[in-house]
Amino acid sequence: MAEGKGFLRLEWARDHMPVIAEIRKRFLDEKPFKGINIAMALHVEAKTGIFSLLLKEGGANVRMASCNPLSSDDSVVESLKTDYGMPVFARKGETQEEYYENLQRTLEKPPDIIIDDGGDLTKLVHTERKDLSKNIMGGNEETTTGVVRLKAMEKAGVLLFPMFDVNDANMKHLFDNRYGTGQSTLDGIMNSTNLLIAGRNVVVAGYGYCGRGIAMRLKGMGANVIVTEIDPIKANEAIMDGFQVRRMNDAIRYADMVITATGMKDVVKYEDALVAKKNIVLANAGHFDNEVAVKEIEKHSLEKREVREFVKRYRLENGNTVDVIADGRLVNLAAGQGHPVEIMDLSFALQALTAEYLVKNHQNLEKKVYPVPPEIDRYVAEIRLKQFGGELDTLTEDQIKYLNSWDEGT
């Protein structure tokens, strides 16, 4: 194989994904996906590439598209196709039409399993390609946004096969959402702006695990962080973690930067942009491009121009100017390299083992959203802990007896 840029990026990722490496040993021997067709819509970059190769090495026929028009690494796409013979349908900067055409192409070989990030592929096989659903065992969903859509489908009674919520596994959301999103979001912002974080007023919209990860990293780099929330419990958490909590339309007046991480649309409205500080930086860490109302901002703008790679400046009707990174799309992948390799090692290990569980147990599953089995969550945690060099205490027989008793007190 020619050692091109994409090939080297894949090899680098493989070298730093020890949990996947451990699982790979067994998959190579047992071939748990032999004869299984898997359609995937994920961010097509190096870590995802190693995950897709793991499934292929486990016997699967994998077809992959991107789950976001701006998140693909073209060098990795080329290497997967050329060096590994994998059908991959993606490029960075897809048009909306290309994006949906590529999703369709993953379905040209009818899938037994789908692995999705954000829910667009799942929606496709529940609408335009509903004819394929009868042969689908089930699937996995990677991210918060997609899980919200899945649960809405389940509630409406339209879910046609079982889906696993990988996002809410402990070894996913406690690490990927918090440490992964926190680091990679700032990586994307700093890569695209070259601006200082220390001393800046930064608004973080949303204090779920993604938002708190971003806020934690900003605080560590010296930013003054203001949080916006709709949930009083999370707002109280933010305050006790040392952050101010304000309404967006108030906070944005003092902010040098706003980062959204909510999974909700119109978090930063056009009305907010009008009262923002001049040249405020607007970035989105959520899955879709509607958290910052970019279309509304563009509609009412007098001028739009690209001021840096990935950054567009809009001059608004009142003369104010705002800088939007990556058209309001997922900043860590559109303007950066995505989550750290070791973080995605955990998430994709969960994905692989849950897909294996689905193959073995799909006949006993209903048309509903399932959590990742706790034994899989714990297994991934144990492998990673061992690789960190960590060791666990074990309970004595007397402690186990105490744990299960009710009559011992003070």
Curated annotation (Swiss-Prot):
NAD(+) binds at residues 143-145, 177, 206-211, 229, 285-287, 332. One of its GO terms (cellular component) is cytosol. GO terms for biological process: L-homocysteine biosynthetic process; one-carbon metabolic process; S-adenosylmethionine cycle. Coiled coil: none annotated. SMART domains: AdoHcyase, AdoHcyase_NAD. It is found in: Cytoplasm. It catalyses: S-adenosyl-L-homocysteine + H2O = L-homocysteine + adenosine. Pathway: Amino-acid biosynthesis; L-homocysteine biosynthesis; L-homocysteine from S-adenosyl-L-homocysteine: step 1/1. Keywords: Cytoplasm, Hydrolase, NAD, One-carbon metabolism. Binds 1 NAD(+) per subunit. Substrate binds at residues 117, 142, 172, 176. It is an enzyme of class 3 (hydrolase). GO terms for molecular function: adenosylhomocysteinase activity. Its EC number is 3.13.2.1. Pfam families: AdoHcyase, AdoHcyase_NAD. Its cofactor is NAD(+). Belongs to the adenosylhomocysteinase family. May play a key role in the regulation of the intracellular concentration of adenosylhomocysteine. HAMAP family: AdoHcyase (MF_00563). This is Adenosylhomocysteinase. It comes from Thermoplasma volcanium (strain ATCC 51530 / DSM 4299 / JCM 9571 / NBRC 15438 / GSS1).
